């Protein structure tokens, strides 16, 4: 019979640190979250390399068999959102709007078109993150379109 003892030290964590640890993603820190970084590692990339070669990285994520649909779609939603946010000052307005819409598209697919229903992952942090990507991306895209046309759509 083995006997042992363990000591545990408990320390307080600030609200900011807690949120960063639990929620650290493109919306809260400006960097990709751990789930997306893990997905990138499956395709042999990292955040910096992926953003430098966005098209190749995106294609690798879309076509890999090493990720399930939820991992792939949530990572793509976050990547497109990062692309849109990083391009605020350098991207053409239409390209930035397109990036927000791509983020919303992948987030919607994650939320409603994967094998598990939203209720089956209701308490998962990743679903909350992806839902926020969807809401934020749609809001930004609509705001940009409205500002671009000031309520007057382009003629066909």
Provide a role label for each language-model segment.
Residues 147-156:
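Long, low-hydrophobicity ectodomains and other hydrophilic envelope-associated domains
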Residues 2-4:
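C-terminal motif of bacterial Sec signal peptides marking the signal peptidase cleavage site
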Residues 6-88, 94-141, 149:
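N-terminal alpha-helical interaction modules that lie
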